Amino acid sequence: MIKFHFTLIFCFAFFLSYGGAISNQLSNDIKTGEIKVNVKKIAPEPVKWDTEIRELIFDDDDELKDGSHFMELFTPYRAADAAIVPISIKFRKNQNEEDFVKYITIVADENPSPIIGKFEFSLKTGKSDFSTRIRIDKYTYVRAIAEMNNGEKYMVSNYVKAAGGCSAPSLADMDTVMARLGKMKMKLIETGEVGQLNKAQFIISHPNFSGLQFNQLTRSEIPAHFVDSIKVTQDNETILNITSDISLSEDPSFTFHYLNTGGELDVTVTDSQGGVFSNKWPIEQILSSK
């Protein structure tokens, strides 16, 4: 009993000495937004990746290296909307002839179709940073896998808390969605003279139905209807070539870079129901519409 009382007194004294400081520090961290959480410590083991998905993409003898020394994946830890989850990939160096990113594969382990898309780059891309928006079906690891021109493969991943994105209804009614199908917009975010690195954003109006959604009026299933390829060129040189599946968000959007050679930007999009959409934007036309 004496030992118990001594322990209680010691704990009380410790709280008086340090409790206020801990409380004040926590309060300050909350106010300044500087609370840091080590996601790797609280995220679950990547069981599905280890047992199922890795072998869908790679051969057994493929070496997959940690890419955190030269690339970074940005995702929300907890997404505000699982149907529109923003992701960005940034690299610490530009494309060059000796060492450049050839492909990036985006994966969400727990999605019904885990391979979200494969993005092909070239020296014309200049810099392989890009951003897009994806659907997430349940809490999952999101991965970016870069394949270099020499065949080496690197991966970075984040754990994202989001659910229901693959079956979430469209943002508008069916008639409105289909009326604007295939409409495109190109926006220059950064532009310069010929030979300089430009940055642009491309958006296409498309429902990107996953096949898991229901018509909100009839409650009938909506067949899958999604963008499955996008190709962006300038002066007959490929800037970006995308092969995608059901996990891109409605109205797919991509931000990308390219080395400007002065010609118009040419985009061709196809979808899973045979739709083909194309458009061209002279640089001057894009600049005048800014």
Language-model features: locations:
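Bacterial N-terminal signal peptides
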Residues: T7-S17
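Low-complexity, Pro/Ser/Thr- and charge-rich linker/hinge segments at domain boundaries
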Residues: V37-V47, A163-K185, I286-K290
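N-terminal edge beta-strand
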Residues: R54-A82, D175-V194
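Short edge beta-strand/loop segments characteristic of extracellular beta-sandwich folds
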Residues: F74, P86-Q95, K199-P207, N215-S220
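Beta-strand signatures of extracellular beta-sandwich domains
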Residues: Y103-V107, S229-T233, T268
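Aromatic sugar-binding surface patches on proteins
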Residues: L123-S131, I246-H257
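Surface-exposed, short loops/turns at beta-strand junctions within beta-sandwich domains
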Residues: R133-Y139, H257-G263
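Short acidic/polar inter-strand loop motif in beta-rich domains
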Residues: M148-M155, D271-K280
